[in-house]
Amino acid sequence: MNKRNDDRILRQISRRRPRRQSSLAPIWVLLGIVAVFLAALLIILLPRGSGNSNISDGTSYVTTDSEGNTAPPDSGGPGEKYPGYKAISLSRDEVHRGDLILVNSDYEYVFPEDADIVGISENKTSDYKVAYDNLRLDARILGIFNDMLAEFSSVMNRRDVIVNSGYRDYKEQQDIYQSRKELYGEAYADAYVQDPGYSEHHTGYALDMSVYTDDGVSMTFDKDPDFTWFYHASHTYGFIRRYADHKEDITGIPNEEWHFRYVGKPHAYYMYSNDLCLEEYIALLRSYPFDGEHLEFRDDSEQLWEMYFIPASDSGATEVYIPTEGEYTLSGNNVDGFIVAAEKKAQ
């Protein structure tokens, strides 16, 4: 090949158009960017679990609002049906749990597997005494009780309250019933001791207390005016005097000066202010369904409350509506439904 031919070939090569790059390359780059964006968006939007799937104990079945506190699983966005409320799903078993459960001769207590029961002696303050070292109570309720006794001892300058009974398991209640029956007869045992499984003491929310002075004098609260403080102030801590003489035909229990039960502050206030026993209050709340008029009132701190009832489904889960904002409590009634108590802003 001579030089002329070489020059000609070189000129032809230099005139050739460069190979066109594939038109698919920019598309693949664009698709890659879109995929990365969608993956990041999916991570952001995926719901994160709260660690609690129901109204189980630990917060006394108190669930709070959107400020980071625990709430049961959401089964519907806020405002889908009722503006200002959102739906959660509760199982039928949840009816048997909460501060307002009614336990009496008609409604048996369902023992939970995760009850937080603690010894009173190991967790009490110096403001009161205990009759026996093995007495127990629900841990959360004991903390509230300690606060109440601290105020009482500060106001009255008395430390003569003695706790005589607290939480009882099934066997303990069985033993007490049998003991009272042998000592005082079956009629007495039937009147003052509930059958095993039907006692409020199973809840860990109830306790019996009286007066026991340093001089060894024992008496009930009604015998000393100082101790009637509990009749008129315990509701500010969420406790009620459970069995009053004039309610015996409803509760089925004769007057008990010593028996107090925790139900929660707003409920205790309303029951105290309107002279209602727990049976009456549970019945009253059924007349305030969620989709109807709600019960509204102000407590002694001028906080406005709304209460409403949602019947439990006979089968499967129940859709319960709770406020999307503000604090609220949620409880089963151990009978047929759920009760919501919500703090409400004044209009």
Which functions belong to the PLM regions below?
Residues 2-166, 170-347:
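Extracytoplasmic cell-surface/polysaccharide-interacting catalytic and binding patches
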